[in-house]
Amino acid sequence: MLLLALIVVILSLLVFAARRRHGYWQRRGIPHDEVHPLFGNIKDWPNKRHIAEIFRDYYFKYKNSDYPFAGFFFFFTRTAVVTDMELLKRVLIKDFNHFENRGVFYNEIDDPLSATLFSIEGQKWRHLRHKLTPTFTSGKMKNMFPIVVKVGEEMDKVFRSKTAADRGQVLEVVDLVARYTADVIGNCAFGLNCNSLYDPKAEFVSIGKRAITEHRYGNMLDIFLFGFPKLSRRLRLKLNIQEAEDFYTKIVRETIDYRLRTKEKRNDFMDSLIEMYKNEQSGNSEDGLTFNELLAQAFIFFVAGFETSSTTMGFALYELARNQDVQDKLREEIGNVFGKHNKEFTYEGIKEMKYLEQVVMETLRKYPVLAHLTRMTDTDFSPEDPKYFIAKGTIVVIPALGIHYDPDIYPEPEIFKPERFTDEEIAARPSCTWLPFGEGPRNCIGLRFGMMQTCVGLAYLIRGYKFSVSPETQIPMKIVVKNILISAENGIHLKVEKLAK
């Protein structure tokens, strides 16, 4: 009887604590939805709706309220969903010192692959960002450009082998372009000729896909990792599957050993990491990287470059197939620039393809691969206006998908219109309203590389092939709701016709 009474008391205290925590926004008078006692405001994810769609709808519901954000709970985690452009700029840029960290899970001791530049916090992030920034200069991109072009040529050969000039062929294009991006990253990050364009079952790609789509514990514990990152770290939980950790550790160690032994230089991402590793080994930790730090950055370079660029290329081809006038205009630009540069793809030539860049930017507006940004308040944010107060430890969500589809910012947002990204149109819009790579000091460090490999790949494909919708093309597009990243459900099937060169 005493035990039963004790259980009742404990459960009552837990219910009281949960209700009190979930009542935070109501006590402050901040607009918010009704909170589920267990799931907070996230009960429809990951089974019914994509998390970015939940934040998008929240943005539209509360964007005209008197407050610059709306209250939200990710289970029991206090979250502020930004609805005001001025607050957005303060979070990402002006008051970045209050919002430096993302508040996501990483465990550098037990799960070294998780301790990436994207995830780590505080002084460690600042030091690592400073060390890695020179790796992504325009000069470094130019050095890696020939590698990207070489893989682009191989992709062209694969597409030609799969299409017939007289009638065309329906292809699932995301898988094919994913093999292109995997071979680019394999070359630039690991110095490997992965050969995945010719071997769809190549281990480098199959393990890579599993590293992105599979996590160690399944959906429920994944949610726990993201909802309670600090507690998960104390419990020594891991995010990445053991096969991925073992595979990439082996690949990176073998690559380092080979290049140090042979003194081979490839002017790629791995060369830069190895130079920093050598600094660490010689006692210069200020400019150096440990093996685990190098491993994590090589891994995130693969994951980010492989998934985001291939997904963006797939969505771009989908929109070009549905908008033949845009495709024709893009093909004309590519042909003109290609001819001007002696019928070669050059670094300078790709930079001249302004309409191609606009097509990619418009694709990323409609389909931002990471469609919401997170920051965490490291200290109380107490500006002059008390409405802007955000308490320490609050997760701040920037609903990029909502902003990208806001008709006050992008009129007729459902229409695919690359001209939105002319210099004049960009200047006429508020800043921080195009967010596929984030913004401010913690934006995506690999932006230039991602744009480069995406533009090169699309230039090869649009120059050589016509893409059209087919009966197998899914219209409207459906996205996979359980993933954090935006991706097409069941792939993207398009009719591909070979063009005369």
Curated annotation (Swiss-Prot):
Its cofactor is heme. Keywords: Endoplasmic reticulum, Heme, Iron, Membrane, Metal-binding, Microsome, Monooxygenase, Oxidoreductase. It is a peripheral membrane protein. It is found in: Endoplasmic reticulum membrane; Microsome membrane. PROSITE patterns: CYTOCHROME_P450. Transmembrane segments: none annotated. Gene3D superfamilies: Cytochrome P450. InterPro entries: Cyt_P450, Cyt_P450_CS, Cyt_P450_E_grp-I, Cyt_P450_sf, Insect_CytP450_Detox. The keyword Electron transport does not apply. Signal peptide: none annotated. Its EC number is 1.14.-.-. It is an enzyme of class 1 (oxidoreductase). May be involved in the metabolism of insect hormones and in the breakdown of synthetic insecticides. Belongs to the cytochrome P450 family. This is Probable cytochrome P450 6a17. It comes from Drosophila melanogaster (Fruit fly). The gene is Cyp6a17.
